[in-house]
Amino acid sequence: MEAALLVCQYTIQSLIHLTGEDPGFFNVEIPEFPFYPTCNVCTADVNVTINFDVGGKKHQLDLDFGQLTPHTKAVYQPRGAFGGSENATNLFLLELLGAGELALTMRSKKLPINVTTGEEQQVSLESVDVYFQDVFGTMWCHHAEMQNPVYLIPETVPYIKWDNCNSTNITAVVRAQGLDVTLPLSLPTSAQDSNFSVKTEMLGNEIDIECIMEDGEISQVLPGDNKFNITCSGYESHVPSGGILTSTSPVATPIPGTGYAYSLRLTPRPVSRFLGNNSILYVFYSGNGPKASGGDYCIQSNIVFSDEIPASQDMPTNTTDITYVGDNATYSVPMVTSEDANSPNVTVTAFWAWPNNTETDFKCKWTLTSGTPSGCENISGAFASNRTFDITVSGLGTAPKTLIITRTATNATTTTHKVIFSKAPESTTTSPTLNTTGFADPNTTTGLPSSTHVPTNLTAPASTGPTVSTADVTSPTPAGTTSGASPVTPSPSPWDNGTESKAPDMTSSTSPVTTPTPNATSPTPAVTTPTPNATSPTPAVTTPTPNATSPTLGKTSPTSAVTTPTPNATSPTLGKTSPTSAVTTPTPNATSPTLGKTSPTSAVTTPTPNATGPTVGETSPQANATNHTLGGTSPTPVVTSQPKNATSAVTTGQHNITSSSTSSMSLRPSSNPETLSPSTSDNSTSHMPLLTSAHPTGGENITQVTPASISTHHVSTSSPAPRPGTTSQASGPGNSSTSTKPGEVNVTKGTPPQNATSPQAPSGQKTAVPTVTSTGGKANSTTGGKHTTGHGARTSTEPTTDYGGDSTTPRPRYNATTYLPPSTSSKLRPRWTFTSPPVTTAQATVPVPPTSQPRFSNLSMLVLQWASLAVLTLLLLLVMADCAFRRNLSTSHTYTTPPYDDAETYV
């Protein structure tokens, strides 16, 4: 492995910690890979090496994922596997999660390599190396080491399901490994009289993902939103999973016969695509209070996986406008945060935006020891004595041109600069004004920080004076967060349009030299002061006038017309964008009537809180700086502006709740489902405020409390002892019946929950498959010679001889220290017991399709039968006539000589 890493110019290392039960796959998130902004042809070649240990012998599996095209495809399967088994390519997936992050997923119950007999139980995963070669030929590497060896135990997983779970017509959608679903449910008591606990299980295609509430339960449900964290089995994503329980009934108005209505939103992750679109989400919840007896309930929802491209993979970008005179212009690139005067490994690249030829447009690459790159036209560069890098461009012509510059230091920390060069008109006497700083604080990390997995974005401080802004000038504060700081939540900016804007001349007719104001130009310039980096023989600059209207531009200030998204905007359907061009601004409480429509001519769609993340064809929300604002535009002045902040720092409609930790909780809202499988309903009609996160789908920031330490042991989850006064010994899914974990409840079996199309589920409902359960369950199982039935039973088509054992035997887990023997524990978990009141779901009864009628009447069928008989009779007559004719011919013929076959006997 060490020899292989020598080819890497930049290497990131991480330690992977797998805990809990084995869900049938393992997932490794790999952040901080560079995807260059403003470039639709910037691809990357990716190869992965997986290092195994087989009984003390090293084994290497090489996977070729080919070329990644982040603008057109998000999920990749290996094109080839070298050193692996015959079906190894079917056991791996590589997925783009947005913000430069990849996720490698591998099945854990099937061996991807060939081993000899007796070695099946000795295969452990040691490390993963990812090789990422960008369009400039730079090799970026990520080495992920397993904190403890992960043993792969090959086994067949039986088909598992849960009986008597109320079905819903709501579909749970998975985007970029994050599931998002909002379900209606009912509890017997009002909010302040209830507690609440929830567990989920996702089953399909030999994958079994379980998620439980971290704190066990919500001890008291409050009016409004009740937020909580959940933990899922297997790999723990750096973006936490969570949920929100919201009371939707008035305090004193229960639903007759069912109780009080609530809305439950769940966002577990990671959810592997290996589940498939036929998988099912089971939600088991419990809630009760001192005034009423509670119970355990179960509802289920179908799962579909979206092929939608996640939010931009592009690196965050600082934007700078430069207006120059003459033939040349220069921009100075400062050092990155991790760089010092002795850093040996520094790389600078440059390319013109929107190239169309990968063979010729990516030749401008410099290092500390390299000379002038071959094939780099109209661009030259050199390191100065203070380690800044000066780039000089020439021969640009009169039209503005955009140059993308990146600078990377030793530990792969990268800053990206978007510089727009505009040539001043020949008639003016304005001296060249260059902004060569690009940053307000050189010690601030910009681009891709090495100390955090959360993607960096650019922020602008709130102004304390009059609001005077343009679409292309924001705070000079650069993007990024320092090591250990709280991650910044990216939010699409109304100004990010992705188009290049021109900087017209704004010279006053009464002054030889005019420096434009940020937002408007006075018709008669008065006495003014000079701007930085600009020389003027006459001190004449118009003072900023908020909301003033320019007589030349004829457009109002952005501060007078910008409409920001409101938090109460409700979108019952996802992905609606305006069919018109320019800018679409969401109005308060706007409702989008159409599912999945996108406009091919829309320049920018300002997302509502219920539909976040750009659709296919949209430009990056991180790095697309333009001169367009909502409600009117003000073109960029001729002089240099400060570096543009690509992301607005003020996002209306978001709610931030923090506690004692800096890690943010991602509850991903729904996004545009253009490529979703058809479903009967959409689940984006929740009335709760939507959430933002560092990932593309957004969501409200909820800072979770980070535990002091993570246990490396694999302790089986189990259900608690029953409450006093209860008699049922059934336990929850995947749990034994001996635990006393707080928040988990068991109650007496009673009335089953309400089905989707019937008032009440019948007792002992059976599944369509032969059912055999472990002793913990009671659905169609034989225990001690007694046949019993019950609700919530989990059933399987596999015999108990293969997966027998009692319910207290732990399931297979990631083993950190010893080899795992072949599993004999039951894969059929105890059922989930139900009691009243029944669950009601907001679903319509599926209508029974009408019985199809015959296409022909009896008379028509009779005519067809007689016609067929006539045809057959005619054919028979023709055959008989032909035979008679041939018989007549044969009888009239006489031989004059013997037959030829006996000719030798006649001489």
Swiss-Prot record:
GO CC term, one of those recorded: membrane
Keyword terms, alphabetized: Glycoprotein, Host membrane, Host-virus interaction, Late protein, Membrane, Transmembrane, Transmembrane helix, Virion
Tree of life domain: Viruses
Places the protein is found: Virion membrane; Host membrane
Region (Disordered): 423-830
GO biological process: symbiont entry into host cell
InterPro entries assigned: GP350_C_dom_herpes, GP350_C_dom_herpes_sf, GP350_N_A_dom_herpes, GP350_N_A_dom_herpes_sf, GP350_N_B_dom_herpes
Self-association state and partner proteins as the record states: Interacts with host CR2.
Protein name per the record: Envelope glycoprotein GP350
